[in-house]
Amino acid sequence: MKVFLVTCLGFAVFSSSVCVNINILQQIGYIKQQVRQLSYYSQSSSSYIVVKLLPNIQPTDNSCEFKSVTQYNKTLSNLLLPIAENINNIASPSSGSRRHKRFAGIAIGIAALGVATAAQVTAAVSLVQAQTNARAIAAMKNSIQATNRAVFEVKEGTQRLAIAVQAIQDHINTIMNTQLNNMSCQILDNQLATSLGLYLTELTTVFQPQLINPALSPISIQALRSLLGSMTPAVVQATLSTSISAAEILSAGLMEGQIVSVLLDEMQMIVKINIPTIVTQSNALVIDFYSISSFINNQESIIQLPDRILEIGNEQWSYPAKNCKLTRHHIFCQYNEAERLSLESKLCLAGNISACVFSPIAGSYMRRFVALDGTIVANCRSLTCLCKSPSYPIYQPDHHAVTTIDLTACQTLSLDGLDFSIVSLSNITYAENLTISLSQTINTQPIDISTELSKVNASLQNAVKYIKESNHQLQSVNVNSKIGAIIVAALVLSILSIIISLLFCCWAYVATKEIRRINFKTNHINTISSSVDDLIRY
């Protein structure tokens, strides 16, 4: 008895609901690549981050004057001044100018936007709406500036307004402040200049799009990651509550920032962070597959199945995920993009090879091998598979669609001149002999489809010709059938007439015989009566 492993992410309950048989699919060139958890997200709330761009430096015993800080402050002012002016033009349009627009009671400086799309105007509305919180946070600028903590919560009463962050302060606190009294002023100034220069380079990279228009160019969280530096995990943890790791959320780009205020005197920047609401569907898995060519019916073919499958319990759907954000372990979507699979496709996913459909390929570059967990799955009938250690050619039999090469078969493998080191064993316990009918192979290439359509048209024309001939024959058969029906009806009527005549004759014969018998009895009685009368007279 053959025993094989069915790697299945769900459990079959109904006959039309089956689980994915990854081992069988691998043997026909359909290889599982990645499994991700499906989550849905929507932008629902906001948080604020105060970025403190000028660090606090403790006074030294030598009363050093750091020229690098003065130069850094001057350069930073030149960088932030256009941003501050642009925000002020959008948030506070001139009362004497008529070129401003109101959206739901909010005044927006249209001239500052330039040529803006609907999405950009929406961003400007968001910027204006955030000014109330920005002013409340700016009112506490002195306390923010006085602290030398890298992460500092800005609170008004018991309500947290924002998180004050200074990435460069973390470097100053951990490295520079411990050496202030042990080095000369020149050495400290050079070290500080190096740190501030690197940080300024990152700021220039992050805010370069903002120099054009902050309302039209939101800051991605990847750029904020450079801005926040080592404080990024702490900020994400403080602003977003979810079981998903901060790295997954940041790499997906679900959080975006927008500059809503710049305080030039204190070198502080208030950034509004759009925080998503994330809901994970616990039993929904999105499986990515990688298709390679296979040797089917003496030709190179490829299986016709979608590259991405959604499996919820024991049901499968095609899942393009065109508008989703993918990370290593999660896929974030705003809505469900599932598409229905045919019953044949579901049966094929379950390992029923007779339900699979393949498409022949010729004259085109195809994926003919893939690395899988330290092994190689290759179509060794369409490319040269040569094992170098030990040295021997790898042959793929006709009844195998692909060949799985693991450490037991080869240590160093060459595929058309490319060398690979095999480091793992395959977890497939056996290779099934495949039997695939010719009807399971269809053409999907445009040229092949045109050729097949020409054949179909020729067949249809021949079919029309045969149909006309058969119609003519049927018409002849119909005429003869009418004559035959009349003859049969006449014969039936004649037979019925004969039968009725015979029955009438039999009835007449029996009736005549009965009448004669009655007459005979009557005459006999009359004779006896006459004899009795004669006897009485006598």
UniProtKB/Swiss-Prot annotation:
Keywords: Cleavage on pair of basic residues, Coiled coil, Disulfide bond, Fusion of virus membrane with host cell membrane, Fusion of virus membrane with host membrane, Glycoprotein, Host cell membrane, Host membrane, Membrane, Signal, Transmembrane, Transmembrane helix, Viral envelope protein, Viral penetration into host cytoplasm, Virion, Virus entry into host cell. Glycans are attached at N56, N73, N182, N352, N427, N433, N457. It is a single-pass type I membrane protein; Single-pass membrane protein. The inactive precursor F0 is glycosylated and proteolytically cleaved into F1 and F2 to be functionally active. The cleavage is mediated by cellular proteases including host FURIN during the transport and maturation of the polypeptide. One of its GO terms (biological process) is symbiont entry into host cell. Residues 20-486 are extracellular. Class I viral fusion protein. Under the current model, the protein has at least 3 conformational states: pre-fusion native state, pre-hairpin intermediate state, and post-fusion hairpin state. During viral and plasma cell membrane fusion, the heptad repeat (HR) regions assume a trimer-of-hairpins structure, positioning the fusion peptide in close proximity to the C-terminal region of the ectodomain. The formation of this structure appears to drive apposition and subsequent fusion of viral and plasma cell membranes. This is Fusion glycoprotein F0. It comes from Mumps virus genotype B (strain Miyahara vaccine). The gene is F.
